[in-house]
A protein has these predicted regions:
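Conserved beta-strand hairpin/beta-sheet module of binuclear metal-dependent hydrolase folds
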Residues: 1-28, 152-165
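Active-site neighborhood of phospho(di)ester-bond hydrolases with catalytic His/Asp-centered motifs
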Residues: 10-12, 35-43, 61-64, 143-144, ...
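Short acidic, glycine/proline-rich loop/turn micro-motifs
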Residues: 12, 172-177, 215-217
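Mobile, glycine- and charge-enriched loop segments
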Residues: 147-181
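Divalent-metal (often Zn2+) His-rich catalytic cores of metallo-beta-lactamase-fold enzymes
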Residues: 160, 170, 182-247, 251-255, ...
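Core dinuclear metal-dependent hydrolase active-site scaffold
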Residues: 123-125, 129-155, 160
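Active-site environment of divalent metal-dependent phosphoester hydrolases
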Residues: 16-17, 42-48, 68-70, 147-148, ...
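Active-site HxH/HxHxD metal-binding segment of metal-dependent hydrolases
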Residues: 17, 27-126
Length: 271
């Protein structure tokens, strides 16, 4: 985002090498430096390139998680890391990897740079913060969903929303097969309803293509929300009836009106 005298960067790519190339591309467009970085959430593929901007950045903004990390989580990190390695196919060749899910392979997985983190200098705990940063109006909104520290950014003058990873063009990881902390699906659905309540004309997700036009945003994000809500409600119903895991898997189906959308998303999964 271009301000009066500087650039405001929303997330930083996933490695120092890729962020350095981004920095070069930005320099061809403007001589304004990146002075502000805003993290949509704490996943490393959104923060890993931050160090490439250490020579100019003055403020790094993030939100604190709405729920504390469960105590003792660090004790299961060895198996979590191993499962993460398997989930994202870090040990596979490009030919062996069928899909990365959300886009191209992460830089550190293929030797294209390493994680280069910088800590936030501004950490908000509020539900919503309005800021004018170098002449650009922002509303930063806490938006629990894929993560408990997730936010979306609303640019009211441009009617643009950056939604982080609470929407992307594939089926979301409602619960990760690598076994991370529980993701609050009911709250995620509420967050998507909140996203839809803003009069955005462009929606920029953290992964996959942007949605342009109010009608497309309402249709695509609305279907995304309704699909999640349907799976969630059906799963709770199965649990209430005492069905086994296998029986639940066989029972849960997307409604007919959402199946075509589901076919577009079923081969991919979020992070």
């Amino acid at each position: 985002v271009e301000g009066d005298t500087s650039l405001i960067l929303i997330d930083t790519l996933d490695s120092d090498a890729r962020a350095a190339r981004l920095k070069d591309e930005l320099s061809r467009l403007t001589d304004k430096p990146v002075k502000t970085i805003i993290f949509t959430h704490g996943h490393p593929d959104h923060r890993g390139g931050c160090g490439a901007f250490r020579d100019t950045v003055e403020e790094i903004i993030a939100f604190a998680p709405k729920k504390a990390v469960l105590k003792g989580t660090e004790r299961i990190n060895p198996i979590l890391n191993k499962r993460t390695f398997r989930q994202f196919g870090y040990g596979l060749t490009d030919e062996e990897l069928i899909t990365q899910g959300l886009g191209i392979r992460e830089g550190h997985a293929i030797g294209d740079g390493v994680y280069s983190f910088l800590p936030p200098t501004t950490l908000y705990t509020e539900d919503s913060v309005k800021r004018t940063i170098d002449g650009v109006a922002f509303e930063l909104v806490s938006a629990v969903g894929e993560t408990d520290d997730q936010i979306f950014l609303w640019l009211p003058e441009e009617r643009i929303m950056c939604c982080g990873d609470n929407y992307y063009g594939c089926w979301p990881n409602l619960y990760t097969i690598r076994c991370t902390q529980y993701r609050d699906i009911a709250q995620w659905i509420k967050t998507l309803e909140k996203i839809l309540s803003y009069p955005a004309e462009a929606l920029l997700p953290g992964h996959t293509a942007p949605l342009i036009g109010r009608d497309q945003i309402l249709e695509v994000v609305g279907n995304f929300k309704n699909a999640i809500a349907s799976v969630f409600d059906q799963t709770l119903d199965c649990l209430g009836r005492g069905l086994t895991l296998a029986e639940t898997v066989e029972s849960v189906r997307l409604p007919e009106e959402l199946r075509e959308e589901g076919k577009k998303m079923h081969h991919c999964v979020g992070s």
